[in-house]
Amino acid sequence: MHPGFNAKKFPDKPAIVMAGSGKIMTHGELNALSNQGAQLFRSLGLKPGDSIAIMLENHFLFFPIIFAAWRSGLQYTAISWRLQPSEVEYIVKDCEAKAFITSKFLEDTAQNLNASLSNVSKFMLDGPSEGYESYEDAIREMSQDPIEDECQGGSMLYSSGTTGRPKGVKRQLTLNPLPYQEDDEDTGLGRALLIYGATEESIYLSPAPLYHSAPLNFVTGFLAQGCTAIILEKFDTEVALKAIQDYKVTHSQWVPTMFVRFLKIDPSIRTQYDLSTHQVAIHAAAPCPVAVKEQRIEWWGPILHEYYAGTEFNGMKIINSEEW
C-alpha cells in the first residue's frame, strides 16, 4: 500500500518504534518525512532510475529515507556500516549513487570518504560534519506534499563479496506510477507478506542490522502494509523477548546465530516473558542446525517459517514448522 494512503487512514498510528529509546514515528509522520525526502532528491536533480546510497546504523530516520527514494523512483543501496572506507567507496561508486547519506555515528568513516566522493551530494544525520550537509536541515525546507511524478523505485543490494568484490544485484525498476487508493493495485511491498498472514494490525519485530536484505525488505513491506515495526537498535536476547511481550509482537525475522544465543539464556529467564501474541517467526540467511531448530520449536511452538532466497531473489522456497 502507498504510505500516503496509510497516513490518511491512520495518521496517528505508530509506524516505527525504536525499542531502545522508545522513540515513535506515526504513519502520518513517516509519510510527511518521506515526502520531504523525495522533494529533496528532486531538488538535487535526481530523476527516476537514478541511485542513492545510505550507510546508517539502525537509525530512527532510516525508513523515511528509504520511502523517499522508493516514491521517487530511485534505486537505493543500503551499505554495511562495518565496512572499511575503501569498501564503502567502491559500492557508492559502483552503484553510481548521486547522493550518499550517513550519520554522525559513522563520522570517522564518512570523513575518510570526503575527497573520493567529491561528485556526490553528501548528507549527515544528527549534526553537521565537514563536507556533509545536514539532512534534517535540508528536508526542513522541503514541502510535505508528494512530488508530481511519483513512481516506484526499489533496492539494489550487494552480495557479501566472498568471491571477490561485492556484486550489486540490480533489478529492472518498473517505475510504475504509485497508487493512492485502497482498491488500486498493490505495488508489491506488502503483498508478499500475505503468505505469513500479515495484516495492518500486525506488529513486526526487526532485531537485525537494517542494511541486510531481509530486515530492509521486510520492514519496508510491513510498513507499506500499514503495520507497526518495532526496531532494535542492537540485538540483545532479553531486549528482544521483552519487546515481543511489551509490544505484543505478532511477526518477527531472525537468523540462526540469534537462535543459538537465545538457547544460551537460562531457562528460568525464558519463562519470565509472555510470548503468547507471537504468531510467526521467520528465519533465513544461513542454514539452521537441526538441533537448534528443534529446540527453538520446542520453546516457541510451531511458529517458525524458513525461506531460502538470498539477496539475489532468483527463486524462493518456504517451509513451515510442520512441513520441516
Briefly describe each language-model feature range.
Residues M1-I16, A32, G154:
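A short N-terminal helical cap/helix-turn-helix that marks the beginning
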Residues F5-K9, L44, E57-F60, P209-L210:
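AMP-binding (ANL) adenylation modules
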Residues A15-H59, F63, Q84-E89:
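Conserved AMP-binding/adenylate-forming core of the ANL superfamily
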Residues S51, E57-P85, K93-A99, L113, ...:
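A short helix-loop-beta submotif of the ANL/AMP-binding
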Residues I52, A69, F100, S159-T162, ...:
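Conserved S/T- and glycine-rich ATP-binding loop of Class I adenylate-forming
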Residues D108-L157, R165, R171-L189, D266:
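ANL superfamily adenylate-forming
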Residues S155-L157, A224, V249-W254, L263-W324:
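Gly/Ser/Thr-rich phosphate-binding loop
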Residues P177-P207, Y211-H251, I265:
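Conserved AMP-binding/adenylation subdomain of ANL enzymes
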